[in-house]
Amino acid sequence: MRRFLLASVCVLISLTFTAAPGHATYVREIVLDNGLKVLLLEDHKSPAVTFQVWYRVGSRNEKDGKSGLSHFLEHMLFKGTPKTKPEEYSRIIAKNGGRSNAFTTTDVTVYFATMSRDKIGIQLELEAERMTQAFLGETYFEPEKKVIQEERRLRTEDNPVSALAEVANAVAYTVHPYRRPVIGWMEDIQNLTRQDLLDYYRTYYSPNNAFIVVTGDFSTEEIVPTIRAAYGKIPRGPVPPKLRVQEPAQKGERRVILKKDAELPFLFMFYHAPNLNDPDNFALDVLTVALAGGRSSRLYHDLVYQKRLTRGVDADYSSVSIDPSGLSISAQLMPGKEPAEVEREIDGLLDKVKTDLITERELEKAKNQIEASFIFAQDSIFGQAMKIGYYEATGGWQRMNDYLDGIRTVSREDIRRVARQYLDRDRRTVGTLIPTKEKVP
């Protein structure tokens, strides 16, 4: 193990993970005395650097009645600091040839920019300042609240499919905070106060509750002292409260019907499934791709090509989450087709996967798709940073080591076993969108 001699403020360790046979990538890990972890991956293919700050806080950390706090705070961090004016952060990055943005999920809040090697220090300093010195003034609080409420209207309330997924998700989880939308419920957003934001900011925005990911054309020996100078002086914050909520086992199918102005009916099925802490996650990934990973997949071939019941069909499963997640199947129906008919067809196809082994060709095709996607996602420095960040946030970036090896070990018997175990109708929630031109109260 290679070690670098640095000041006592940090420890630097060089570690590796293998993204593909014969392709080694070197991630170097720093931990400052204040608890801030920094993950560095040099890649000199193009003259750019991606710098990301990940906070270990998302909608799962919010309380009932306070949904949307994480996302609201993300917006407010662009309203200035002692050294920058409102919205000036983005202008400074753009003026120096960079691109910047931020996003919030159930598990994390992330701020990022991609700039040239000689300019990345600008963003590094800006992010260090707003870690603890963001202006959360009353002047911008109420106007930004209206912006977020309008965002919710456009993305969810005026989008029938998003609205269905949101309400189905709220029914699928009865206890766990994953039941709440990341953007928040409209009434909760309306009732949030500036003091709520201040308390949340002081609780979760600190070096010991964050980590940095840097990828691209930089020198570790040069950037480490810069990071140390900017972030090492920020004091460690209080230890954020630990969230330990376990969703009770679902013991019966749940259903929700949403009547909304829409073009066509839509069907959404959600099955509870484990995250990356369970070794079954590899087989579930392969199962998901075999079911609906492309036009030759089982569901797509049957529902779209042969039976012409749906315009499309999709299956989604992500093991990269802090808590157990789910496997979902969704489909937009063809005109004149009934949701019950499509549901029966899907159930029949799922039953076949539970009773009969998928073919060797299906297995290898799904594995190849997953491997290609995993490697392609790291083709850009931004994609590399995102992959490292998500794994670090949910279980440790080192788990990237195991992913492709885990996929390669999946057998046809594994696929049948996890299909039987997790595609259980007593463990699912079915959401149906019924189009209507009438205003539903």
Q: In which residue ranges do the predicted regions lie?
A:
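Positively charged n-region of N-terminal signal peptides that target proteins for export
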Residues: 1-4
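Bacterial N-terminal signal peptides
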Residues: 7-16
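Boundary at the C-terminal end of the N-terminal hydrophobic targeting segment
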Residues: 19-24
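Charge-rich, well-structured scaffold segments of protease-associated domains
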Residues: 26, 31, 90-239, 257, ...
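M16/MPP (pitrilysin/insulinase) zinc-metallopeptidase core fold and M16-derived inactive scaffolds
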Residues: 27, 45, 50-114, 180-183, ...
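Peptidyl-prolyl cis-trans isomerase
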Residues: 42-45, 263
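His/Glu-based metal-binding/catalytic segments typifying zinc-dependent metallopeptidases
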Residues: 153, 170, 239-298
